[in-house]
């Protein structure tokens, strides 16, 4: 009975680890594709730091959402 419980817990832990690894891979692909909030608003060449409350302007500069692109 104890062995069965240990095996079930081990399988659950391994399954959780696989899901975490898969989620991290999908997140990296999503970030590289330019679909994050900041990069979606302009050029994809602003870099990974331009996201959240920022936007990427056509001249590849990262600005606040409240600033206009000049």
UniProtKB/Swiss-Prot annotation:
It is found in: Secreted. Disulfide bonds join 46-57, 50-62, 56-69. Transmembrane segments: none annotated. The keyword Amino-acid biosynthesis does not apply. The keyword Metal-binding does not apply. It holds the Pfam family Conotoxin. InterPro entries: Conotoxin. This is Conotoxin Cal6.11.
């Amino acid at each position: 009975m104890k062995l069965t419980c240990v095996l079930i817990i081990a399988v659950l832990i391994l399954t959780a680890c696989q899901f975490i690894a898969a989620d991290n891979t999908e997140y990296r692909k999503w970030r590289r594709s330019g679909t994050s909030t900041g990069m979606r608003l302009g050029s994809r060449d602003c870099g990974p730091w331009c996201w959240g409350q920022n936007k990427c302007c056509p001249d590849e500069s990262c600005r606040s959402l409240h600033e206009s692109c000049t």
